[in-house]
Amino acid sequence: MCTAATYQTRGFYMGRTLDYEFSYGEEIVITPRRFPIALRHGGVMDTHYAIIGTAHVADGFPLYYDAVNEKGLGMAGLNFVGSAQYAEVVPDRENIAQFEFIPRLLGRCATLAEAREALRTLNLTGTPFSERLPASQLHWLLADKSGAVVIESVADGLKVYDDPAGVLTNNPPFPQQMFALNNFMHLSPKQPENLFSDALPLTLYSRGMGALGLPGDLSSASRFVRAAFTRLHSVSGEGEADSVGQFFHILGAVEQQNGCCEVRPGEYERTIYTSCWNADRGIYYYTTYTNRRISAVELRREDLDAAALIRYPMRTREDIFYQNAPGTES
């Protein structure tokens, strides 16, 4: 399962957790402007906006999990198993396979408004990448500094929903997730008053009691509520370090620890990586399950007019700083 979120301070930030029981060998992948993106149902995007994000590169093609383009439009795909239904190929339509959905939108659209227009005419198909890599059942969070939408391809068509909560998890479908927030309208970061009865001398015995009832389990419905509550009440400084640090704390509220979510006997879902990007500056930050230090790759330090993918392996070895090591300044 996964969780994605947006966050606005002086800059605009977005990112996600990838929660799964195994890795496909994810990398930080930059698709420069002149890398040819061959579309499965015809046509090649010879030139496009530069993109940075996490992807599995298969047969030279970047299968993006999440990414942001040089203009500040970002997108993340999250599991939507059992609910996602894609269209069949339709002649005389722009047919886009789900695995090329992220590079198609981010490669051609500079803003959320432009992406909304593109979605009016796209036909999203379930064409598999290969026999080894069938179509993933996904829905997507798409956002820039102007707002966020959720895209779901379901039995009755492609749906685009405004997302005022600024978060997305997995099932159930997004309208149900938003409706369920009504059950938690009493939650608050403030300490509660005794509204139970004037006849009872009820007292506060702990801090944080305003959020009693906030779900704490790992289900996607509970993570949606917890991520929304945490994001909407987060407070941080406006600077880069404060903003990035707070974003990782927001997603830290829903990260999964190895051993707590068994998917098969002896196999456990865990947060393989957490990402955060500064959409304005094109900086992609991440941590991994086995390296909690924040690493970063900056889009604009590369040759964005190149024609080959630029790839950085994720850092997965724990990096511990010894403050009292000889010659070390704390």
What residue ranges belong to the model's regions?
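Short, flexible loop/turn elements at secondary-structure junctions
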Residues: 18, 79, 144-146, 155, ...
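Short, surface-exposed beta-strand-loop junctions and turns on beta-sheet-rich folds
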Residues: 20-22, 81-83, 156-159, 166, ...
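Broad, structure-driven detector of short, well-ordered beta-strand segments within folded domains
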Residues: 28, 68, 149-153, 159, ...
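C-terminus-biased signal that marks the final domain/tail of proteins
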Residues: 1-13, 127-130, 135-136, 145-147, ...
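Catalytic cofactor-binding cores of redox enzymes
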Residues: 121-159
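A contiguous strand-loop segment
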Residues: 1-94, 126, 313, 323-328
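Proteins synthesized as precursors that undergo proteolytic processing into mature forms
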Residues: 92-128, 240-248
